[in-house]
Amino acid sequence: MNATDSNAMKNQRSWRIGIFGTFDVENYGDLLFPIIAELELSRRLGSVELTPFSYHAKSSDDWPYGVESLAELPRMASDLDAILIGGGFIVRFDKFIAPGYGPPATWIHHPTGYWLAPALVGAQHGVPVIWNAPGMHCNEIPDWSHPLLSLALDSSAHIAVRDEPSKTALRPFVEPQRVHVMPDTAFSIGRCLKSHAATDEAAAIRDALGLKAPYLVIQATQNLERLTDYLKKFRTELPNLSVLLLRLGPVLCDHESFIDSELQGTFCLSAWPSPMVLASLIGGSEAVAGHSYHLAITALSCGVPVFSSSDLSQGKFTALAKFDTVHPLPPEGCDDPQWLSQRMGRKEPSHVVVEANDMLENYWNHVATVVRAGKTDSTTATSAFLMSLPGILEHGQRQAGAGDPESADHLRDLKARLIGCEDSLGEAKAQLSEVTRRSLDLETQLLELHQSMSWKTTAPLRRAWRWLQGLSA
């Protein structure tokens, strides 16, 4: 079947697109990506059947949308028309993603099972793989992953990451010009909210709470004392300002108890709402505060200033440094009652946000073109990799067996020093044993002396002698 015939068949059904990430946890930013992808691709492709894949299956009855378990991917992969990897901070190899979070089966590697493995499966089936602006965050890429990462990137139809540090990290594994830096796809959330039903639901929540404008959104998390202390200190200067505490990442332990309970005028939600309702609540505020990356992005896309507790010079947060409405928290002990009010206030999104949306428009247009182009023949790349696999494994085994010569010499030196220390310890123990024996002998002799008749007989003489010494003194 040629590409024309294949596309003709697809025109008679929905486009089947899989998106991969951590969509099975209560984390605001992660849950946005499938929603945005479906909205953007439906505008361009018509009927789209977007299937989020994560470790654990979820039902739309009690989750924002249905999620398929990654355990089903081997069965479903051949029916997909495209694969989106991410976004979010998913290009990682450490094991701690969230408390208790892991794969549903031991044969799924953690954590590459939800990003690297799907890209490899896509390469196997010739399904176009699009890296949907995921990212890294100051993390390492282990040696064992290099061949697999190279194959996945080489076989991908489009590679977009969300910041320069991520691009720098991935460039050694593919032709550098193929890695593109794009804004996080959540920068389009302001546009996606227009005419969305979530705006009405957010308004109903505000009415039920009695929350009126203006209000400040504070992420219910740690390390925001500088802001809450400032608000308490100058509460009389901001009498009409309400504070809405939001859990952006319950899975990462966000909770209202982290925020000073003495802060007046605060409101909390009784239940965690859908991601789009959270976005609407954020977008309706006059400012937001917290460390969440997607709290900041959502606010910026709606023209809302941000007070961030994060270091904008590190990792993923570097992408926020170019926005002049991203501010640090108030300085320690700030005495300026106008410091906060001078920086608050929702306005039209900045020109940087407008440019980000223009880039995302072009990105989604390109993604739609890639999807329409259909599957590709990736057998050459996968066959070459399989032929190289024995050599890769053998080299890895040799590396593990041989080790670094300098390290081996160092280990031998440590062993020799350990033996010397053990000998010295043995000698010290022998000396201690001899001293202990002699001490016991002396104690026995002293006890026998005190119990002897001569000691008892001479006791009056010793007392008289001590009395005479006292007189002479």
Where are the predicted features?
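Short intrinsically disordered, low-complexity segments
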Residues: 432-434, 462
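Bacterial/eukaryotic Sec-type N-terminal signal peptides
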Residues: 1-4, 437, 473
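Active-site anion-handling motifs in enzyme catalytic cores
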Residues: 2-424
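Short hydrophobic helices that act as membrane-entry/anchoring signals
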Residues: 444, 451-473
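Alpha-helical coiled-coil heptad-register detector
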Residues: 406-409, 413, 420, 427, ...
